[in-house]
Amino acid sequence: MKFLSFKYNDKTSYGVKVKREDAVWDLTQVFADFAEGDFHPKTLLAGLQQNHTLDFQEQVRKAVVAAEDSGKAEDYKISFNDIEFLPPVTPPNNVIAFGRNYKDHANELNHEVEKLYVFTKAASSLTGDNATIPNHKDITDQLDYEGELGIVIGKSGEKIPKALALDYVYGYTIINDITDRKAQSEQDQAFLSKSLTGGCPMGPYIVTKDELPLPENVNIVTKVNNEIRQDGNTGEMILKIDELIEEISKYVALHPGDIIATGTPAGVGAGMQPPKFLQPGDEVKVTIDNIGTLTTYIAK
């Protein structure tokens, strides 16, 4: 399944992509009319949080089938053209990010590969697919992109052993880790440079792990104005998905809806000669095989 959160007619909702259509089943409405018992999560985060007692996907499947068979299926579908995509997990939980997890990317920025580099991104930085974000020209002329695979956590745990780590994964999404390279180079921490308003585009969907079991050999391509800038593969990650979860959970308790950004391949603007930073009016597309394409526009 492909889950998403969205705004329609000024109301926030969530849903699951309609198969073979650019449309979403509005699960707020579907559950209101076809839920079994009192199962009626109001947000995707609430659904994930209840997944430990009920099979969330099975509840979704049953409710959608009932809507399809009702004779009024179209009443529960909304075209992608009519919605505003929100970050898939809404309201947002923690976003924990790994830097320097691709050797070639670390090398292009002259960073040490051996040292673990972890940071968080502010919840206020999150935005969805097709968003226009500020150009931040008032504070920087070094706005950069980083296309990344995101892991969506599906159940709570800490000190999770590598052998069990994948049991805690609910699915995967796409992240563009927008970065102010000027602030990053001037400061001893990454939080501010990584938490600009609009600095964490995410989506368009969460693809559940039954559809994408282990994306450790999928292509990540980032284009700026249709020019390929990053052309990498998750097989290049230094720490794999199970190792990332094991490492983070040694220190931080993970909960449903938490997102782990797994690092970016080579090809960022700061690594080019001369550097090629984002400019007002730019279009940035991050595509990951079997998930989709995340599009972001830089305000003029």
From Swiss-Prot:
Q: Which family does it belong to?
A: Belongs to the FAH family.
One Pfam family this chain carries? FAA_hydrolase
Q: Which residues bind a divalent metal cation?
A: E146, E148, D177
InterPro entries associated with the record: Fumarylacetoacetase-like_C (IPR011234), Fumarylacetoacetase_C_sf (IPR036663)
Q: What is this protein called?
A: Uncharacterized protein SAOUHSC_00906
Q: Name one GO molecular function term.
A: acetylpyruvate hydrolase activity
Q: Which UniProt keywords apply?
A: Metal-binding
Alphabetized Gene3D superfamilies for the sequence:
Fumarylacetoacetase-like, C-terminal domain
